[in-house]
Amino acid sequence: MLCQNCNINEATIHLYTSVNGQKKQIDLCQNCYQIMKSGGQEALFGAGNASNGNSDEPFNPFNDIFSALQGQDFNGAASNQTPPTQTGGRGPRGPQNPRAKQPKGMLEEFGINITESARRGEIDPVIGRDEEIKRVIEILNRRTKNNPVLIGEPGVGKTAVVEGLAQKIVDGDVPQKLQNKEVIRLDVVSLVQGTGIRGQFEERMQKLMDEIRKRNDVIMFIDEIHEIVGAGSAGDGNMDAGNILKPALARGELQLVGATTLNEYRIIEKDAALERRMQPVKVDEPSVDETITILRGIQARYEDYHHVKYTDEAIEAAAHLSNRYIQDRFLPDKAIDLLDESGSKKNLTLKFVDPEDINRRIADAESKKNEATKAEDFEKAAHFRDQISKLRELQKQEVTDEDMPVITEKDIEQIVEQKTQIPVGDLKEKEQTQLINLADDLKAHVIGQDEAVDKISKAIRRSRVGLGKPNRPIGSFLFVGPTGVGKTELAKQLAKELFGSSESMIRFDMSEYMEKHSVAKLIGAPPGYVGYEEAGQLTERVRRNPYSLILLDEIEKAHPDVMHMFLQILEDGRLTDAQGRTVSFKDSLIIMTSNAGTGKVEASVGFGAAREGRTKSVLGQLGDFFSPEFMNRFDGIIEFSALSKENLLKIVDLMLDEVNEQIGRNDIHLSVTQAAKEKLVDLGYNPAMGARPLRRIIQENIEDSIADFYIEHPEYKQLVADLIDDKIVISNQTQETAETTDEEVPAE
């Protein structure tokens, strides 16, 4: 098969494309393909087809391929990139298509006129940015290097400064040199789009700059200006937008306003030649009071859009609550989001129909009614007549100020609760009862540790009514005491009371963080290490669920760097992860458990001087494991006392309830006599080991016996455990009752 271009060499390259739904195949030799790749269609025709005379052929096979590559139909209207050799092009060889439109200017095609939007009143009022706007005007008024770049965190109002500049130009409140200027926002993505062939992007940029020079009234605004570095460069020697703009920016031929974040501005700073042509203008995050002023300025716009009313308390709550509880965002953006979302939510309850929509539906029904009348389909005509009358009734309904929904502080609080899962509203009746009874509910499950329960309950109550310290966690406690006395159990029950499940907490076993290199897992690996892109195990979970309970089990086993990390968390309620994000712990409850020092102190049971001496001894032993600055940052160091036999009797009841819950799936119920319970306590009592031996005793004497009895007698569902001959025996409850009755009759 010969090359379709030169008809001399063997075709070794086959190109496939789809044009207007039809598959096309082009067969080329290596030489013709290289010519086409480097020089485009004109070079290919000049080199290969000159001898064949095929360059003017109206249906040349290459036309479709180049039309497809350039995003146009060969027979349709050609863009300004169409080579003059193609039929239908702008050259003398191709007749003009009568349907072809006159091409728009590059600025109209790839830009949005912000000044025109300001004239039409389509932009929101810009409030509290007078200093930044004044600084931008001063830079634009310079002779050279008059290109301000607004830098600041996302959502602080950088684009609003440019809109404020456009509004001042419309109002005439600018120097004479800036009068009648047009601020046009350039879309860099659209500018790059469709420039896959080498040289197309440079040509488009050159035409854009020529147009700006001719007009001499354009201030070009590029949002995310760091995109111009590398834009249009395909890696094969093409120049990017930044390099093309450099000469014009230096001489003042082109006035450019940019906006980007602090992190992304570093991309521009890497190109020193480009960076020196720009003048940075820092846009800081507004304060809460300034945010309230901004919200009041745009309040009317959101009220008109959502057909609602905002109270002054709602405006203030949006600023204060967003600043307090929404951590990853910046003012005023996150406060405006609360206004917008609360308005959207309230608007859903409003029975309001757009008048323009009603008019359109009435006109449509009128035309259909007339068509039905002409077709003598009177039943259908009557249907449309009734529909028109209903629409006219709707048209008369108007939403008055009395009917308009009002957004209050409670509505804003509900939005914050939905976003963060943090309860910030007024105490509901159920929650109020829960907080009142919190200590009693915890004491019912955590036996013998009343002091620890009371301190935890008071800390949560303080935080819930707004008396907590603003920059510290809800509470931070170190639980110390011998093993098996309920330190971890108290944390589980607290999570169950607050979040509904004992597993709803962020729990870390500190034995996993004994090595120095493993500490980085909490906040993420540092740059240059494996796992840098992965989030920290602690910081990411707290960032997603700020209202949470964090349990660090056996803290004395952790590497000292973990405690150094928590110094800042316990004091300031914040920590920066490996990605540079600041994570707030202000709404978290931090509990650490430890049995450090208890091994050196003899366990004792009871009250009085002996216990007081033991307490002092344990706290003295803690200094051997923890530094003073670490222990000094806790809200409380709570010692858990050893359990007495009376405590164990109550714990036995709780453990037996768990056994009944497990066997209840098989419709079995177990009753245990008081004598059997006391026997279980005698077998499992060990002050040094706490309640854990009791669980093993119940497993050996109760659970194993139940399993044996049920396998032999599956028909019995009501079981009883009793002490017979100093042994715990499982039997059928009916049988046990009968035997007891027989023994009592002779005694009478």
Curated annotation (Swiss-Prot):
One matching Pfam family: AAA_2
Renumbered residue ranges of the record's region II: 407-598
Positions annotated to bind ATP: 152-159, 481-488
Residue intervals of every C4-type zinc finger in the record: 3-32
Low complexity composition-biased segments: 80-99
GO terms for biological process, alphabetical: cellular response to heat
SUPFAM superfamilies assigned to the protein according to its UniProt record, in alphabetical order: C-terminal UvrC-binding domain of UvrB, P-loop containing nucleoside triphosphate hydrolases
GO cellular component, one term: cytoplasm
GO MF annotations in UniProt: ATP binding; ATP hydrolysis activity; zinc ion binding
Protein's job: Along with ClpP could be necessary for degrading proteins generated by certain types of stress.
Residue span(s) of domain UVR: 359-394
Keywords carried by this UniProt record: ATP-binding, Chaperone, Metal-binding, Nucleotide-binding, Repeat, Stress response, Zinc, Zinc-finger
Miscellaneous comment in the UniProt entry for this protein: Disruption of ClpE reduces tolerance for puromycin.
High-level lineage: Bacteria, Bacillati, Bacillota, Bacilli, Lactobacillales
Region (I): 107-354
Source organism per UniProt: Lactococcus lactis subsp. cremoris (strain MG1363)
Protein name: ATP-dependent Clp protease ATP-binding subunit ClpE
Residue segments, region Disordered: 74-104
Keyword Protein transport: no
CDD domains xref list: AAA (cd00009), RecA-like_ClpB_Hsp104-like (cd19499)
Family label: Belongs to the ClpA/ClpB family. ClpE subfamily.
